[in-house]
Amino acid sequence: MTGPGVDVRELGAQRLARAQQALRDHDLPAAVLFDPADVRYVTCDGSYLVANLHCSYRWALVFAEHDPILWEPTESIGLARARYAGEIRPTTSFTFFGSGDHSAEHARAAMAEVHDELRVRGLAGGPLGIDRAEAVVFLALAGLGVRLVDATPVLEVARAIKTDLELDIHRDNARLVDEAVRRFLDHLVPGRTEHELWARLMYEAFTTGALHSESRLLSSGPRTNPWMQEASARVVQDGDPVAFDTDLVGPHGYLTDVSRTYVCGDADPGRELRDAYRAAHGFVHEAIPEFRAGRTFRELGELLGPRLPAAYRAQRYPFLAHGCGAADEYPAIVVDGHHDGALEPGMVISVEAYCGREGGTVGAKFEEQILVTSGAPELISHAPVEDRLL
């Protein structure tokens, strides 16, 4: 499915149809979108993705009943036309980086163009959804008298259910990550730093088309407890655990989020690590069959939360599971503080656990990715497990 095997025009058409239906379901005639994940979803991939995460240089106006309009930087319009058949216009930059003290003025000009498109369609008096943007954008739209509503829930719920083509991409991206992890294991030897090991894992992923990772979560030895410590200059020793979370956004912008813990070298890793690994691995694989369509998020949280061994609850991971798409996204399955909703076929979910005793010397992270179907969940991540710890 990677590369030329994906019909990006059809992919875009399927996603747009879902977004437009979501707008209709929420009685929202239009939304102006700046979040790169949402813009990509209703139009096409952009360039400079990581920069776009903090700099709003492209946006889209999507309508419930009309074709969307994409505003693209002039230098990128040619690339966008190869991916998107709809209307594309050059942007009026308004970021402070590009506009300086003219930022507010430029934002007013850009949003006046958006407002004109609402007006000609008879939508200027209705609500306009918005996901996120710089303050100057909100001020400009407020100055035009636009009634803004939060479009993030609308788009996140739409994105949570994947089309068949999206599911195929998720499967393929997971396979590529599995292959990257297998190749990475050939380089997991004592004497290398965490930085070197993370670089090797990313090298193996990027050679298969990965776009970026959401984190640098790789730790070793005592830095595996507590979790969430990113790669450092620590030199990995014989017998150390090495734990990582891929958080990899792969080809076509779809996330493969899996975690593994391995033993580096030949020395005995010790009972503390074995116990932690068995607990994390066992929790995840015993939980996966519970992820069936119709199960509410609350039911899953209340069912699975008590299954985590008491010895590891003080430092448990905040999520039991979460949705995957353009990033870690809706829904989140938690122990408490549940939100409404239920699993549906087409959701892509990562199920995870961290096990490390409070005050302990090591810990283990384990995570798998699954597809929710009309029957049993489909496991799509198959990176090797650490047999020496089972």
Q: PLM ranges: what are they?
A:
Residues 1-390:
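Active-site neighborhoods and metal-handling regions in enzymes and metal-associated proteins
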